[in-house]
Regions:
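Metallo-beta-lactamase
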Residues: 1-55, 59-62
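C-terminal regulatory/interaction regions
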Residues: 69-106
Length: 106
């Protein structure tokens, strides 16, 4: 999936392998150099070209690094909030971080 302007929902990708596959799919999409990508989940006006793909890809990379650096969801949440201040849908970040750190089953 592709997102824009909101925290990316990662609760359904609970393994590094599934998130890597997601990244690979985004790479394939970007390689087609689309004029516009309409994200499945977004707020505001999506950017032209691959902007939404690039945003999602960057977010996933940062999420992966935060997971590697922190054992608990609070650390992941705080890291992503600092990296994306004011980004909407913090509840998606919070639930996704809890699921991906094993604090919550999904």
């Amino acid at each position: 999936g592709v997102a824009w302007g909101i925290h990316v929902w990662t609760a359904d990708t609970q393994t590094p392998e599934s998130r890597k596959q997601w990244q690979e799919t985004l790479e394939h999409m970007a390689a087609h150099k689309p004029e516009r990508v309409i994200p499945g989940h977004y707020l505001g006006t999506p950017p032209a070209g691959t902007g939404a793909i690039d945003f999602t890809r960057d977010y996933l990379q940062r999420f992966e690094k935060a997971l590697a650096a922190h054992k608990d969801s609070a650390g992941v949440i705080n890291t992503l909030k600092k990296q994306y201040p004011g980004l909407a849908d913090e509840s998606s970040l919070e639930l996704s971080a809890k699921v991906n750190t094993g604090e919550m089953k999904w």
